[in-house]
């Protein structure tokens, strides 16, 4: 609920959400339903309905440019994180999810890899630095500009 409130109060242009995901090499985790992610192999970039494609691609380009290792994970209808709240409130905030792979989630012996923690921080830092002032990731801005261009090329009957 906090993420939805934030969108109303500060009206962000972009939301890069961080959370954790399962290290699926952990015993009793089903790779068929959870995907394949492991600690020590980098942050996990999510593909999901709430994740804005243009922003996600910027994050991937940033990781590749800065040689930050990363993994990919597909989510179904919901990510189960604040990404959903940002994406579907206040007219839709361009949102992305970068997760930290975690072994033994919700136990007293949770484990992460130090390199993954550092790479999550680097990836967010470099991505934020790549953003331009008032840059829009909105699908609507792109389609609106294309529609305007089409109209200018072919304004219809005179």
Regions found by a protein language model. Give the residues of each.
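Acidic/histidine-rich catalytic neighborhood of metal-dependent amide-processing enzymes
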Residues: 1-42, 83, 135, 139
């Amino acid at each position: 609920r906090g993420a939805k409130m934030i969108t109303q109060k500060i009206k962000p242009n972009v939301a890069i959400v961080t959370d954790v995901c399962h290290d699926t090499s952990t015993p009793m985790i089903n790779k068929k339903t959870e995907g394949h992610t492991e600690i020590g192999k980098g942050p996990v970039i999510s593909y999901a309905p709430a994740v804005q494609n243009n922003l996600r691609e910027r994050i991937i380009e940033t990781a590749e440019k800065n040689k930050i290792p990363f993994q990919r994970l597909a989510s179904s209808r919901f990510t189960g994180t604040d990404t959903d709240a940002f994406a579907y409130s206040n007219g839709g905030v361009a949102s992305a999810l970068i997760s930290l792979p975690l072994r033994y989630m919700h136990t007293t012996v949770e484990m992460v890899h130090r390199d993954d923690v550092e790479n999550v921080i680097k990836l967010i830092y470099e991505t934020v630095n790549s953003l331009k002032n008032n840059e829009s990731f909105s699908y609507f801005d792109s389609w609106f500009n294309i529609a305007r261009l089409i109209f200018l090329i072919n304004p219809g009957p005179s």
